[in-house]
């Protein structure tokens, strides 16, 4: 049908639509041609984009709302179906684990190990996996039942002994529940916990003060009672409050109460830093004792102390060394001393410490020869109840959870009782005592003692009596494991040679690199790295001289002699320094380093301290500490036969941070150091020779290179503070000499061996690393150490041994 026929059929007449108002409207047809659609405007585009953005934002908000609901407001108890499913899963797992443990009890031990903290479970699981990989199921099961299970039982006993009832009560306070997991905490966590403990102590102080703030008339005894309440809270944490012995309540008090100590004591108990030091020390000790309980401190694992403590000590040394290198000491006159050089020149240097003790022992030997005394070498060991691990690395069944500190206290108490009985019997001796650890960290003593020949048998018998009187039944007829004595035969060696090895291996292992320890199987030089953290962690005094004058006065006399030599200048060498000839003779002996003469001039051995001619003088420090009290520092020396005191520390030094070196701050020697990676400053213009030769005040600089020693000495002492500071700044800007290119020559076989050793240590063994080592460089190996190639073998950097 055509279009016209359709119009006729529908009665449509074009003549009837002569006007626009009666013309038919166009029908709405979605299938129109795209060209006939109205064009899209800018406003319609904006509306469309806005609607799309709103839709995306709405979807994002709905997703976030679902996440927030699931995380904070959704609980399984609100969904019974899911809750029932989760409960069924847990019940089925528990039944399966129970069935497995019923048929295989070893699964219970493995589950208990995995439930321990990481510092316990990780090393134990490594050993368990090793035994499992051997393919010997009986040996594997026996190891779990005979070694791991007793270790876990001992660990629980150690934890119970560490967490006392009062300590648990303190942990019940709000925010202090972290005290229950103190050994598992890191340093940051201990810092946060110490802040909470300090806040708790502050609240206790506010509650204890009561109405004291409202009254002006407060008696000192009322303040002391307030201090007692805060100190009682501190004692609940197994921490002794500061000045506790002087301020605590006593029935028969001979001296008046020092009320001036209360402010400093309270300031410390309210300080977060003070609590951090106490809690961190407690954390390290508790953690170490837990590792001893599971046999991780022994000759089979880590001798003397845990590997974690050794790594912590290495990092502490590295930080201390960086601190010393970045600071210097400055006095009022502007003189500066490098702090690293000062530390190395003091007794903190292991070499100086070892030399001083060896000189002292040699002096005792010479005095003994002069007096006709004999020398005896003793070894005293604690009973078996103090030893946590056997020599084969298995737990000791007789161990009573005794700590390393308790073993040291046992020996100290035993020695005090013996000394009292010896003096009561009229016997005397003098010598040196060395404390060192067994492979499990338990303390034992070596003593080199000098005595009269007629008293040797009596002293030895009395010492043996006190050394074996506890747990005597475990020794039987053989007392060797607890007590040994050996009369030193001059034909075999001198007393100094007997004790030299024990002194060296407990300091830095000097000269003992080739000797192997019978107890640990390692070099004695390497053992020194483990002994120092052991003594520091457990607060064990390693060396002790007795029966001789104090060595601090000896050090002060040597310091005074050096100061006098610099001040005398042109005076004849050996001129008297002190007016009193007796005192000057003691100073001369100390300056010469002869301990024998020094001891005899002081009065000799076995002389009470009140009869020594020269003693160390102390004074109250003028500058207060951070807690408001004034400490005590060494002033110099004094003598009861001379008036006044002699000051050896007249110059006061302050520790300041070193100035930044311009050459290190900006590589281009520009006007200032860049604060970004690149420096956009222009290069510094070269100064002319006249500006270089002028000082800061415009005066020409003096040429010190052409002066002789006397002129240079006079010129340096006549300089002002400003000129000294300028000279020090000029010396810092001196460019260091660059080393020439250096490269070791090795064969192809040695190169392959070097690559293999690098790969075995975890490195890539690439040509770049090999070339770096051959040119004298080093590669960091972790814990502040570096490896380098020397004498055709890889070595580990141990430069810290020469500094600490």
Swiss-Prot record:
Enzyme class per UniProt: hydrolase
Similarity field: Belongs to the phage GPA family.
Single GO BP term: DNA replication
Classification via InterPro entries: Replication_gene_A-like
Keywords of this entry: DNA replication, Endonuclease, Hydrolase, Nuclease
Pfam families, per database record: Phage_GPA
Active site: 498, 502
Keyword Cell inner membrane among UniProt keywords: no
One term of GO molecular function: endonuclease activity
The keyword Hydrolase is annotated on this UniProt entry: yes
E.C. designation(s): 3.1.-.-
Protein name, per record: Probable replication endonuclease from prophage-like region
Task performed by this protein: Possible endonuclease which induces a single-strand cut and initiates DNA replication.
